[in-house]
């Protein structure tokens, strides 16, 4: 039951992950705030789904979900791709957001990425389609988390696609492609609500550390480094992340 007077934490998992990514946050904040977690299109429970949408479609659908659920005070907490969806949402509906928390994500502005990075982002599907699945499973788990809990959880989420590597490759390839296309739009992607940047010191996914340094430098949005955490820092250091989110929300009117 949604309390319309309370803040709603809207958790958006990263690419190929699902609602379980935020289990430790749901457990901690449940009962304190309204909670919404979204399996993005083509992910987990949101399957089957056609791959004919872009990042702004995802933002629009999220808006429709919030409308339907009568969520009027959303604070988006987006991990990786979820953070990009949050920025697209902020671009389309700047007055709707009460707060934005980026966890191991990066800015959507075109100026932060090179032409070579955009070129690669659009051509990742064949890589994921032809990479040996067992190696992909290992790199996909060890590469995003440092803790046993974080790695085991990511492995469980990846095993949803066990036996259907084509679907996994489609989800990943399409996700990176629509990310590149959103960057190429060269829109302001300005966050006008209270915001917080969080990044693990062991985040080796892409260039997240470099991007977050530049994002903080250019916008002065507070940036918190999570010592010893990987790309899924909310699974590596959940207590620290929960404390930061809790402190952030307490300052939102």
Across the structure, where does each feature detected by a protein language model lie?
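Conserved loop-alpha-helix segment in the C-terminal half of the alpha/beta-hydrolase fold
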Residues: 195-229, 235
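Conserved HGGG/HGGXW glycine-rich cap/lid loop of the alpha/beta-hydrolase fold
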Residues: 2-48
């Amino acid at each position: 039951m949604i309390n319309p007077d309370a803040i709603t934490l809207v958790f958006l998992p990263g690419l190929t992950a699902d609602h379980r990514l935020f289990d430790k946050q749901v457990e901690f904040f449940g009962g304190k705030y309204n909670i919404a977690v979204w399996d993005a299109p083509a992910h987990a429970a949101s399957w089957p789904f056609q791959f004919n949408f872009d990042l702004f479609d995802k933002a629009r659908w999220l808006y429709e979900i919030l409308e339907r659920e009568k969520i009027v005070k959303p604070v988006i907490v987006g991990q990786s791709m979820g953070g990009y969806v949050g920025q697209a949402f902020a671009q389309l509906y700047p007055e709707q957001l009460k707060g934005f928390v980026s966890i191991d994500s990066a800015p959507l502005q075109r100026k932060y990425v090179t032409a070579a990075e955009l070129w690669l982002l659009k051509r990742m599907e064949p890589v994921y389609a032809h990479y040996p699945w067992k190696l992909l499973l290992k790199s996909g788990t060890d590469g995003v988390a440092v803790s046993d809990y974080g790695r085991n959880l990511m492995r469980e989420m990846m095993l949803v696609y066990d036996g259907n590597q084509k679907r996994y490759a489609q989800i990943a390839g399409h996700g990176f492609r629509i990310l590149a296309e959103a960057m190429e739009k060269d829109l302001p992607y300005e966050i006008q609500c209270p915001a917080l940047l969080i990044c693990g010191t062991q985040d080796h996914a892409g260039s997240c550390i470099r991007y977050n340094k530049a994002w903080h430098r250019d916008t002065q949005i507070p940036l918190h480094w999570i010592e010893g955490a990987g790309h899924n820092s909310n699974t590596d250091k959940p207590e620290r992340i929960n404390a930061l989110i809790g402190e952030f929300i307490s300052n939102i009117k």
